[in-house]
Design a protein with these regions (language model features):
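N-terminal Sec-pathway targeting helices
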Residues: 1-18
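Histidine-centered active-site loop/cap adjacent to the catalytic His
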Residues: 9-11, 22, 381-420
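Membrane-interface motif at the C-terminal end of an N-terminal transmembrane signal
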Residues: 19-36
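Generic structural signal for small/hydrophobic residues in well-ordered secondary structure
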Residues: 24, 103, 148, 164, ...
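Membrane/wall-proximal cationic-aromatic binding patches
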Residues: 35-128, 333-339, 348, 368-378, ...
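Conserved SGNH/GDSL esterase-like catalytic core that processes O-acyl groups on lipids
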Residues: 74-75, 88, 93, 97-99, ...
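Second-shell loop/turn segments in exported
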Residues: 104-110, 137-138, 279-283, 337-340, ...
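Serine-dependent acyl-ester chemistry module
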Residues: 169-359, 369-370, 416-417
Length: 420
Protein backbone atom coordinates (compact mmCIF):
# COMPACT_ATOMS: atom_id res chain seq x y z
CA UNK A 1 0.00 0.00 0.00
CA UNK A 2 2.87 2.35 0.77
CA UNK A 3 4.50 1.92 -2.61
CA UNK A 4 1.46 3.07 -4.64
CA UNK A 5 1.00 6.00 -2.24
CA UNK A 6 4.61 7.03 -2.65
CA UNK A 7 4.32 6.64 -6.40
CA UNK A 8 1.23 8.83 -6.43
CA UNK A 9 2.96 11.50 -4.36
CA UNK A 10 5.98 11.28 -6.61
CA UNK A 11 3.84 11.72 -9.71
CA UNK A 12 2.03 14.67 -8.12
CA UNK A 13 5.32 16.29 -7.13
CA UNK A 14 6.70 15.74 -10.60
CA UNK A 15 3.54 17.25 -12.07
CA UNK A 16 3.82 20.32 -9.86
CA UNK A 17 7.47 20.80 -10.79
CA UNK A 18 6.64 20.37 -14.47
CA UNK A 19 3.76 22.84 -14.23
CA UNK A 20 5.98 25.39 -12.50
CA UNK A 21 8.69 24.90 -15.10
CA UNK A 22 6.20 25.38 -17.94
CA UNK A 23 4.75 28.43 -16.20
CA UNK A 24 8.22 29.89 -15.70
CA UNK A 25 9.01 29.37 -19.36
CA UNK A 26 5.74 30.92 -20.53
CA UNK A 27 6.22 33.99 -18.32
CA UNK A 28 9.78 34.48 -19.57
CA UNK A 29 8.57 34.17 -23.15
CA UNK A 30 5.69 36.58 -22.55
CA UNK A 31 8.06 39.08 -20.92
CA UNK A 32 9.99 39.28 -24.18
CA UNK A 33 6.94 40.47 -26.09
CA UNK A 34 4.62 42.10 -23.57
CA UNK A 35 5.75 45.31 -21.83
CA UNK A 36 3.08 44.81 -19.17
CA UNK A 37 4.27 41.30 -18.30
CA UNK A 38 7.88 42.48 -18.37
CA UNK A 39 7.12 45.32 -15.94
CA UNK A 40 5.47 42.88 -13.51
CA UNK A 41 7.79 39.89 -13.88
CA UNK A 42 11.27 41.35 -14.31
CA UNK A 43 12.90 43.58 -11.66
CA UNK A 44 13.76 46.95 -13.14
CA UNK A 45 17.47 46.59 -12.44
CA UNK A 46 17.59 43.20 -14.20
CA UNK A 47 15.79 44.07 -17.42
CA UNK A 48 18.01 43.54 -20.39
CA UNK A 49 18.61 46.67 -22.45
CA UNK A 50 16.38 46.66 -25.51
CA UNK A 51 17.27 48.24 -28.81
CA UNK A 52 14.69 50.68 -30.13
CA UNK A 53 14.61 52.13 -33.62
CA UNK A 54 13.19 55.43 -32.41
CA UNK A 55 12.03 57.33 -29.35
CA UNK A 56 8.45 56.67 -30.43
CA UNK A 57 9.15 52.93 -30.36
CA UNK A 58 10.54 53.22 -26.85
CA UNK A 59 7.53 55.20 -25.63
CA UNK A 60 5.23 52.59 -27.17
CA UNK A 61 6.96 49.97 -25.01
CA UNK A 62 5.59 51.71 -21.90
CA UNK A 63 1.82 51.39 -22.53
CA UNK A 64 0.76 51.53 -18.89
CA UNK A 65 2.73 54.72 -18.24
CA UNK A 66 2.78 56.59 -21.55
CA UNK A 67 -0.76 57.23 -22.81
CA UNK A 68 -1.15 59.89 -25.54
CA UNK A 69 -3.80 62.49 -24.77
CA UNK A 70 -4.71 60.94 -21.44
CA UNK A 71 -6.98 62.93 -19.17
CA UNK A 72 -4.72 63.51 -16.18
CA UNK A 73 -6.41 65.43 -13.38
CA UNK A 74 -8.54 67.28 -15.97
CA UNK A 75 -5.55 68.20 -18.17
CA UNK A 76 -4.56 66.48 -21.40
CA UNK A 77 -1.25 64.70 -21.72
CA UNK A 78 0.50 65.58 -24.96
CA UNK A 79 0.65 63.53 -28.15
CA UNK A 80 3.67 61.59 -26.86
CA UNK A 81 1.82 60.63 -23.68
CA UNK A 82 3.84 62.95 -21.43
CA UNK A 83 2.49 65.35 -18.82
CA UNK A 84 3.33 68.51 -20.75
CA UNK A 85 2.31 70.75 -23.62
CA UNK A 86 3.01 69.70 -27.20
CA UNK A 87 6.73 69.95 -27.96
CA UNK A 88 7.94 72.32 -30.68
CA UNK A 89 10.04 70.48 -33.27
CA UNK A 90 12.35 71.77 -34.57
CA UNK A 91 13.39 73.92 -31.66
CA UNK A 92 12.65 77.60 -32.38
CA UNK A 93 15.78 79.67 -33.13
CA UNK A 94 17.28 81.32 -30.07
CA UNK A 95 15.39 79.19 -27.55
CA UNK A 96 17.16 77.66 -24.55
CA UNK A 97 15.77 74.18 -24.07
CA UNK A 98 15.98 71.86 -21.07
CA UNK A 99 15.15 68.17 -21.48
CA UNK A 100 14.13 66.84 -18.06
CA UNK A 101 14.50 63.13 -17.33
CA UNK A 102 12.99 61.29 -14.38
CA UNK A 103 10.31 58.96 -13.12
CA UNK A 104 6.83 59.66 -11.76
CA UNK A 105 8.14 62.53 -9.61
CA UNK A 106 9.18 64.34 -12.77
CA UNK A 107 6.03 63.29 -14.63
CA UNK A 108 3.99 64.75 -11.78
CA UNK A 109 1.18 63.08 -9.85
CA UNK A 110 -0.67 66.38 -9.69
CA UNK A 111 -2.49 68.48 -12.33
CA UNK A 112 -0.26 69.82 -15.10
CA UNK A 113 -0.06 73.46 -13.82
CA UNK A 114 1.25 72.20 -10.45
CA UNK A 115 3.95 69.75 -11.57
CA UNK A 116 7.52 70.56 -10.58
CA UNK A 117 8.61 70.79 -14.23
CA UNK A 118 5.78 73.13 -15.21
CA UNK A 119 6.61 75.35 -12.25
CA UNK A 120 10.34 75.12 -12.99
CA UNK A 121 9.79 76.51 -16.47
CA UNK A 122 7.76 79.40 -15.04
CA UNK A 123 10.31 80.12 -12.30
CA UNK A 124 13.22 80.17 -14.74
CA UNK A 125 11.26 82.43 -17.07
CA UNK A 126 10.81 84.86 -14.18
CA UNK A 127 14.44 84.87 -13.01
CA UNK A 128 15.93 84.84 -16.52
CA UNK A 129 14.24 87.88 -18.13
CA UNK A 130 14.66 88.08 -21.86
CA UNK A 131 15.47 84.38 -22.19
CA UNK A 132 13.22 82.31 -24.44
CA UNK A 133 13.20 78.90 -22.79
CA UNK A 134 11.19 75.74 -22.36
CA UNK A 135 11.43 72.64 -20.19
CA UNK A 136 10.43 69.39 -21.89
CA UNK A 137 9.03 67.04 -19.25
CA UNK A 138 10.18 63.54 -20.20
CA UNK A 139 9.29 62.08 -16.81
CA UNK A 140 7.84 58.57 -17.10
CA UNK A 141 6.50 56.57 -14.17
CA UNK A 142 8.27 53.34 -13.29
CA UNK A 143 11.47 54.15 -15.17
CA UNK A 144 15.07 54.31 -13.98
CA UNK A 145 18.49 55.56 -14.99
CA UNK A 146 18.78 52.99 -17.76
CA UNK A 147 15.59 54.38 -19.31
CA UNK A 148 16.94 57.91 -19.03
CA UNK A 149 19.94 56.71 -20.99
CA UNK A 150 17.66 55.32 -23.72
CA UNK A 151 15.71 58.59 -23.98
CA UNK A 152 18.92 60.59 -24.29
CA UNK A 153 20.28 58.30 -26.98
CA UNK A 154 17.08 58.43 -29.03
CA UNK A 155 15.81 61.94 -28.33
CA UNK A 156 18.71 64.38 -28.35
CA UNK A 157 18.87 64.83 -32.11
CA UNK A 158 15.13 65.48 -32.44
CA UNK A 159 14.57 67.82 -29.50
CA UNK A 160 17.98 69.52 -29.53
CA UNK A 161 18.21 70.50 -25.83
CA UNK A 162 20.87 72.88 -24.59
CA UNK A 163 20.78 71.25 -21.17
CA UNK A 164 19.80 67.75 -20.06
CA UNK A 165 18.49 67.57 -16.49
CA UNK A 166 18.42 64.24 -14.64
CA UNK A 167 16.00 64.16 -11.70
CA UNK A 168 17.32 61.24 -9.64
CA UNK A 169 14.85 59.89 -7.07
CA UNK A 170 16.87 58.46 -4.19
CA UNK A 171 14.00 56.18 -3.15
CA UNK A 172 14.24 53.85 -6.13
CA UNK A 173 16.71 55.13 -8.72
CA UNK A 174 19.40 54.14 -6.20
CA UNK A 175 20.34 50.43 -6.08
CA UNK A 176 18.99 47.95 -3.54
CA UNK A 177 22.13 47.59 -1.40
CA UNK A 178 20.37 45.47 1.24
CA UNK A 179 19.77 42.74 -1.31
CA UNK A 180 23.49 42.43 -2.02
CA UNK A 181 24.21 41.54 1.61
CA UNK A 182 21.23 39.70 3.07
CA UNK A 183 19.51 37.94 0.20
CA UNK A 184 22.17 35.75 -1.29
CA UNK A 185 20.90 32.45 0.11
CA UNK A 186 20.08 29.73 -2.36
CA UNK A 187 16.35 29.79 -1.63
CA UNK A 188 16.04 33.55 -2.02
CA UNK A 189 18.21 33.45 -5.11
CA UNK A 190 15.84 30.94 -6.72
CA UNK A 191 12.82 33.08 -5.92
CA UNK A 192 14.66 36.22 -6.96
CA UNK A 193 15.32 34.90 -10.47
CA UNK A 194 11.89 33.30 -10.91
CA UNK A 195 9.82 35.41 -13.27
CA UNK A 196 6.71 33.39 -12.39
CA UNK A 197 7.13 34.20 -8.70
CA UNK A 198 7.77 37.88 -9.43
CA UNK A 199 4.73 38.11 -11.72
CA UNK A 200 2.45 36.52 -9.15
CA UNK A 201 3.74 38.67 -6.29
CA UNK A 202 3.45 41.94 -8.18
CA UNK A 203 0.04 41.04 -9.61
CA UNK A 204 -1.24 40.48 -6.06
CA UNK A 205 0.24 43.82 -4.98
CA UNK A 206 -1.54 45.54 -7.84
CA UNK A 207 -4.78 43.83 -6.87
CA UNK A 208 -4.30 45.08 -3.31
CA UNK A 209 -4.03 48.64 -4.46
CA UNK A 210 -0.59 49.36 -5.87
CA UNK A 211 -1.37 51.24 -9.08
CA UNK A 212 1.02 51.96 -11.93
CA UNK A 213 1.45 55.65 -11.18
CA UNK A 214 0.23 55.69 -7.62
CA UNK A 215 -2.52 58.18 -8.37
CA UNK A 216 -5.37 56.35 -6.69
CA UNK A 217 -8.79 57.83 -7.12
CA UNK A 218 -7.60 60.22 -9.83
CA UNK A 219 -10.47 62.10 -11.48
CA UNK A 220 -12.29 59.97 -14.02
CA UNK A 221 -11.42 60.39 -17.67
CA UNK A 222 -13.70 62.32 -19.98
CA UNK A 223 -14.30 61.33 -23.57
CA UNK A 224 -12.86 63.68 -26.18
CA UNK A 225 -15.60 65.60 -28.02
CA UNK A 226 -15.86 64.59 -31.66
CA UNK A 227 -13.71 66.64 -33.97
CA UNK A 228 -11.59 68.04 -31.13
CA UNK A 229 -7.85 67.31 -31.19
CA UNK A 230 -6.58 67.43 -27.59
CA UNK A 231 -3.58 69.64 -26.88
CA UNK A 232 -1.20 68.71 -24.09
CA UNK A 233 -1.36 70.92 -21.02
CA UNK A 234 -4.85 72.26 -21.77
CA UNK A 235 -7.94 71.62 -19.61
CA UNK A 236 -10.21 68.75 -20.55
CA UNK A 237 -13.20 70.54 -19.06
CA UNK A 238 -12.46 74.27 -18.54
CA UNK A 239 -15.47 74.56 -16.26
CA UNK A 240 -14.26 71.86 -13.90
CA UNK A 241 -11.84 72.53 -11.06
CA UNK A 242 -9.86 69.83 -9.26
CA UNK A 243 -9.53 70.93 -5.65
CA UNK A 244 -6.10 70.90 -4.05
CA UNK A 245 -7.78 68.96 -1.24
CA UNK A 246 -8.93 66.20 -3.58
CA UNK A 247 -7.99 62.85 -1.96
CA UNK A 248 -5.97 61.95 -5.08
CA UNK A 249 -3.74 64.96 -4.36
CA UNK A 250 -3.47 64.58 -0.60
CA UNK A 251 -4.02 60.90 0.13
CA UNK A 252 -4.28 58.45 1.64
CA UNK A 253 -3.59 56.66 -1.64
CA UNK A 254 -2.52 53.07 -0.90
CA UNK A 255 -3.64 50.52 1.63
CA UNK A 256 -1.42 50.31 4.71
CA UNK A 257 -0.05 46.97 3.54
CA UNK A 258 0.74 48.19 0.05
CA UNK A 259 2.37 51.38 1.29
CA UNK A 260 4.52 49.44 3.77
CA UNK A 261 5.76 47.34 0.85
CA UNK A 262 6.66 50.50 -1.10
CA UNK A 263 8.53 52.02 1.84
CA UNK A 264 10.33 48.74 2.49
CA UNK A 265 11.70 48.73 -1.05
CA UNK A 266 12.91 52.30 -0.55
CA UNK A 267 14.58 51.86 2.82
CA UNK A 268 16.69 49.01 1.46
CA UNK A 269 18.48 51.63 -0.67
CA UNK A 270 19.79 53.27 2.50
CA UNK A 271 21.36 50.15 4.00
CA UNK A 272 25.06 50.64 4.74
CA UNK A 273 27.03 47.37 4.84
CA UNK A 274 30.30 47.05 6.73
CA UNK A 275 32.18 46.30 3.52
CA UNK A 276 32.39 49.42 1.29
CA UNK A 277 33.11 47.19 -1.70
CA UNK A 278 29.49 45.99 -1.57
CA UNK A 279 28.25 49.56 -2.01
CA UNK A 280 30.60 50.08 -4.94
CA UNK A 281 29.40 46.87 -6.59
CA UNK A 282 25.74 47.76 -6.10
CA UNK A 283 26.19 51.25 -7.53
CA UNK A 284 28.34 50.25 -10.51
CA UNK A 285 25.46 49.72 -13.01
CA UNK A 286 23.74 52.98 -12.01
CA UNK A 287 26.90 55.04 -12.28
CA UNK A 288 27.69 53.28 -15.56
CA UNK A 289 24.39 54.45 -17.03
CA UNK A 290 24.96 57.99 -15.73
CA UNK A 291 28.39 57.99 -17.33
CA UNK A 292 26.92 56.81 -20.64
CA UNK A 293 24.43 59.69 -20.50
CA UNK A 294 27.23 62.15 -19.75
CA UNK A 295 29.30 60.83 -22.64
CA UNK A 296 26.43 61.14 -25.13
CA UNK A 297 25.41 64.61 -23.95
CA UNK A 298 28.97 65.93 -24.05
CA UNK A 299 29.59 64.30 -27.42
CA UNK A 300 26.80 66.42 -28.84
CA UNK A 301 28.18 69.56 -27.24
CA UNK A 302 25.35 69.88 -24.71
CA UNK A 303 25.38 70.41 -20.96
CA UNK A 304 24.25 68.06 -18.20
CA UNK A 305 22.97 68.66 -14.67
CA UNK A 306 21.60 66.39 -11.96
CA UNK A 307 19.14 66.96 -9.11
CA UNK A 308 18.60 64.52 -6.25
CA UNK A 309 14.97 64.12 -5.20
CA UNK A 310 14.60 62.83 -1.61
CA UNK A 311 12.42 60.03 -0.31
CA UNK A 312 10.10 60.88 2.57
CA UNK A 313 12.16 58.40 4.59
CA UNK A 314 15.11 60.77 4.23
CA UNK A 315 13.08 63.83 5.15
CA UNK A 316 11.16 62.45 8.16
CA UNK A 317 13.33 60.48 10.65
CA UNK A 318 10.23 59.41 12.58
CA UNK A 319 8.87 57.61 9.50
CA UNK A 320 12.19 55.84 9.08
CA UNK A 321 12.28 54.72 12.72
CA UNK A 322 8.66 53.56 12.67
CA UNK A 323 9.23 51.50 9.53
CA UNK A 324 12.30 49.81 11.02
CA UNK A 325 10.32 48.98 14.15
CA UNK A 326 7.59 47.41 12.01
CA UNK A 327 10.05 45.47 9.86
CA UNK A 328 11.87 44.03 12.87
CA UNK A 329 8.72 42.05 13.70
CA UNK A 330 9.28 40.03 10.55
CA UNK A 331 11.85 37.21 10.62
CA UNK A 332 13.31 38.48 7.37
CA UNK A 333 14.31 41.81 8.97
CA UNK A 334 14.72 40.75 12.61
CA UNK A 335 18.38 41.82 12.65
CA UNK A 336 17.78 45.20 11.00
CA UNK A 337 18.58 48.21 13.16
CA UNK A 338 18.24 51.93 12.61
CA UNK A 339 22.01 52.22 13.02
CA UNK A 340 22.51 50.04 9.95
CA UNK A 341 20.86 52.67 7.76
CA UNK A 342 22.46 55.75 6.25
CA UNK A 343 19.76 57.90 4.64
CA UNK A 344 22.47 60.01 2.98
CA UNK A 345 24.09 57.05 1.19
CA UNK A 346 22.62 57.70 -2.29
CA UNK A 347 23.30 61.41 -1.96
CA UNK A 348 26.95 60.87 -1.05
CA UNK A 349 27.48 58.40 -3.88
CA UNK A 350 26.05 60.87 -6.38
CA UNK A 351 28.03 63.79 -4.95
CA UNK A 352 31.28 61.89 -5.45
CA UNK A 353 30.30 60.96 -9.00
CA UNK A 354 29.26 64.51 -9.91
CA UNK A 355 32.54 65.91 -8.62
CA UNK A 356 34.55 63.34 -10.54
CA UNK A 357 32.53 63.82 -13.74
CA UNK A 358 32.44 67.63 -13.44
CA UNK A 359 28.63 67.73 -13.52
CA UNK A 360 26.73 70.46 -11.66
CA UNK A 361 24.47 68.76 -9.11
CA UNK A 362 22.02 69.83 -6.44
CA UNK A 363 20.66 67.78 -3.55
CA UNK A 364 17.10 68.80 -2.66
CA UNK A 365 17.11 66.81 0.59
CA UNK A 366 18.22 69.69 2.87
CA UNK A 367 15.62 71.95 1.24
CA UNK A 368 12.85 69.44 1.93
CA UNK A 369 13.99 68.90 5.51
CA UNK A 370 13.90 72.65 6.12
CA UNK A 371 10.50 72.90 4.44
CA UNK A 372 9.16 70.09 6.65
CA UNK A 373 10.19 72.09 9.71
CA UNK A 374 8.88 75.45 8.52
CA UNK A 375 5.29 74.31 8.00
CA UNK A 376 3.01 71.45 8.95
CA UNK A 377 1.54 71.38 5.43
CA UNK A 378 2.46 67.97 3.97
CA UNK A 379 5.15 67.65 1.33
CA UNK A 380 4.21 64.06 0.51
CA UNK A 381 0.79 62.49 0.07
CA UNK A 382 -0.52 60.34 2.89
CA UNK A 383 0.31 56.67 2.37
CA UNK A 384 2.11 57.47 -0.87
CA UNK A 385 5.74 58.19 -1.75
CA UNK A 386 4.87 61.10 -4.07
CA UNK A 387 4.74 64.83 -3.51
CA UNK A 388 1.71 66.93 -2.79
CA UNK A 389 1.24 70.18 -4.67
CA UNK A 390 3.37 71.86 -2.01
CA UNK A 391 6.13 69.30 -2.50
CA UNK A 392 6.18 70.06 -6.22
CA UNK A 393 6.47 73.79 -5.44
CA UNK A 394 9.41 73.24 -3.09
CA UNK A 395 11.22 71.15 -5.69
CA UNK A 396 10.61 73.67 -8.47
CA UNK A 397 11.85 76.60 -6.38
CA UNK A 398 15.04 74.77 -5.41
CA UNK A 399 15.79 73.59 -8.94
CA UNK A 400 15.15 77.04 -10.39
CA UNK A 401 17.63 78.58 -7.95
CA UNK A 402 20.16 75.92 -8.94
CA UNK A 403 19.66 76.16 -12.70
CA UNK A 404 19.41 79.93 -13.06
CA UNK A 405 23.17 80.32 -13.30
CA UNK A 406 23.26 77.76 -16.11
CA UNK A 407 20.30 79.17 -18.02
CA UNK A 408 20.12 82.93 -17.65
CA UNK A 409 21.76 84.47 -20.71
CA UNK A 410 21.91 87.87 -19.04
CA UNK A 411 23.80 86.49 -16.08
CA UNK A 412 21.03 87.45 -13.68
CA UNK A 413 20.92 85.35 -10.56
CA UNK A 414 17.98 83.63 -8.99
CA UNK A 415 16.64 85.21 -5.82
CA UNK A 416 16.91 83.41 -2.54
CA UNK A 417 13.82 81.23 -2.25
CA UNK A 418 12.35 80.54 1.17
CA UNK A 419 10.88 77.09 1.86
CA UNK A 420 7.24 76.93 0.72
Amino acid sequence: MRTPARSTLGILALGVVAALAVGEGLVRLAARWSPTVRDLAVPRGEREPRAFASLEAYLASQPTQVVPHRNWFNYWNNALGLNDVEFAVPKPPGRFRILALGDSFTYGLVPYPHTAMTLLEARLGAVCPGTDLDVLNFGIGGTGVRDYRTIVTLGLATYDPDLVLINFYAGNDAPNVYQYVHERSRFRTVLGVSRLWMLGRNAIRLWQGVHDLGAGRAPAATDTPRGLVPRGGTPVDPGRHVSEQDPALTGPIFTETAFAAIQTEEIRRFYLPENPAVVDRAWRPVLGDLEAIRTEVFRRGRRLALAVYPSALQVYPAQRAALVETLRRRPRYAALSIDALDPTLPNRQLAVYCQRAAIPCVDLTPVFIEASRSSAEPLYKQRDAHWTIRGNRVAADAEAAFLAGLVCSSGSQAPNVAPR
